[in-house]
């Protein structure tokens, strides 16, 4: 199986990246001689619909593209790297820190990491984002990568940037947050370089990424610390968060696994329900402890694929059952909001049939669907059947 590097592109001024413009970057013409690849891995360059740092539809595109490559090529899923430059680096911070168990290493090259401080970059067409209403400030916790910096303890990040880059402050900011989280920050600085990739610095970045690739992913870490602010980003290796006390507030779980498989949860902040996936808690000797109390577990009975759910009920943690048997209610993964998620996965449009009771309403509904079909095709590149 081969290593896969997912490379996210930067923004394109001034009108956005069209499909033809994007494909033209890789067109070598019709000459008989083609440039031979000088690497022993596959590179995937997703377009990512809408230039918003690979959020929403762009995020869906990245993961669907990865799955398509894995179907068509023999890819080692334990050696998938995520890297990018500029907006692509921002997407690398965003996707990598929020999906820390999906990638073996991250390689952001000069990318922004937050909303407020980035908006203060001294560029003429930038609009400074001042204080926002409380609900909007809370919503930023879903977007800003700095709020997920603690997850760099799960997926290593090797950042790089030029010391003359106008966005240099973004990496300074991320370094400050790493320090607060107690995580060393690797930031390779290219002297005298602006907002471009320096070949020498990039080579060192790739060398260090290669060291992590050689080790591969560890799907059963003995120590796990995972931070999120929304159930949209709820999975890290054998841990799956299922319910939070308060959305858009920091949720953190810290757990350690002993030699006999016993899990001790040291911290479960702003979390109401979570699941432990295999290979954890499969041994008869394994126990589960949270809030200094051991919770009785069912006998494995030879089942090595069971996923166990734990819920806080009346302020007390209890075993709730298997993942397949527990019915989730309220905000839950995939139905946690905001409404943008409805257009990031398959959805259903219902066409009117027969004769409408009210012809005016029927005409309005038909016109609305035609408008939606036009706009969805224009911006999201999707045709209604």
Task: Please annotate each region the language model reported.
Residues 2-73, 347-348:
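Active-site machinery of serine-nucleophile hydrolases
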Residues 10, 16-28, 101-149, 154-155:
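Mobile cap/lid helix-loop segments that gate and shape the active-site cleft of serine hydrolases
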Residues 1, 172-176, 180-384:
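Alpha/beta-hydrolase-fold serine-hydrolase catalytic core, especially in secreted/extracellular enzymes
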Residues 54-87, 97-103, 151:
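Gly/Ser-rich "nucleophile elbow"/oxyanion-hole loop immediately N-terminal to the catalytic nucleophile
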Residues 82-84, 109, 160:
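Short beta-strand immediately N-terminal to the catalytic nucleophile in serine-hydrolase-like folds
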Residues 121-197, 203-210:
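The feature captures the conserved acid-bearing segment of alpha/beta-hydrolase catalytic domains
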């Amino acid at each position: 199986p081969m290593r896969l590097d997912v490379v996210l592109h930067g923004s394109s001024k001034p009108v956005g990246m069209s499909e033809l413009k994007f494909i033209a970057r890789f067109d070598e013409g019709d000459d008989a001689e083609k440039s031979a690849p000088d690497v022993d891995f596959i590179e995937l360059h997703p377009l990512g619909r809408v230039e918003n740092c690979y959020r929403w539809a762009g995020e869906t595109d990245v993961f669907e593209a990865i799955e398509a490559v894995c179907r068509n090529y023999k890819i080692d899923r334990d050696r998938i790297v995520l890297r990018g430059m500029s907006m692509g680096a921002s997407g690398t911070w965003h996707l990598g820190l929020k999906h820390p168990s999906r990638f073996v290493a991250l390689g952001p090259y000069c990318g922004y990491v937050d909303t407020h401080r980035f908006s203060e970059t001294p560029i003429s067409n930038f609009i400074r984002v001042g204080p926002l209403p409380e609900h909007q400030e809370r919503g930023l916790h879903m977007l800003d990568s700095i709020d997920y910096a603690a997850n760099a303890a799960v997926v290593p990040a090797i950042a790089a940037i030029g010391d003359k880059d106008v966005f240099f402050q973004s990496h300074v900011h991320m370094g400050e947050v790493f320090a607060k989280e107690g995580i060393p920050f690797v930031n390779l600085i290219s002297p005298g370089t602006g907002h471009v990739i320096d070949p020498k610095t990039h080579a060192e970045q790739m060398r260090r990424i290669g060291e992590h690739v050689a080790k591969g992913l560890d799907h059963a870490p003995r120590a796990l610390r995972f931070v999120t602010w929304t159930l949209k980003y709820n999975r890290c290796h054998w841990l799956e968060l299922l319910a939070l006390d308060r959305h858009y507030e920091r949720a953190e779980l810290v757990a350690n696994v002993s030699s006999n498989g016993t899990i001790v949860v040291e911290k479960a902040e702003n979390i109401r329900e979570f699941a432990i996936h295999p290979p954890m808690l499969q041994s008869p000797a394994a126990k589960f402890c949270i809030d200094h109390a051991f919770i009785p577990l069912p006998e494995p009975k030879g089942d090595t694929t069971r996923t166990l759910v734990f819920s806080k009920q009346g302020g007390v943690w209890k075993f709730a059952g298997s993942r397949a048997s527990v019915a989730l209610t309220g905000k839950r993964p995939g139905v946690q909001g905001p409404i943008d998620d409805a257009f990031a996965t398959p959805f259903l449009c219902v066409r009117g049939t027969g004769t409408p009771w009210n012809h005016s309403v029927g005409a309005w509904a038909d016109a609305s669907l035609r408008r939606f079909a036009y706009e969805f095709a224009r911006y999201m590149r999707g045709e209604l059947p």
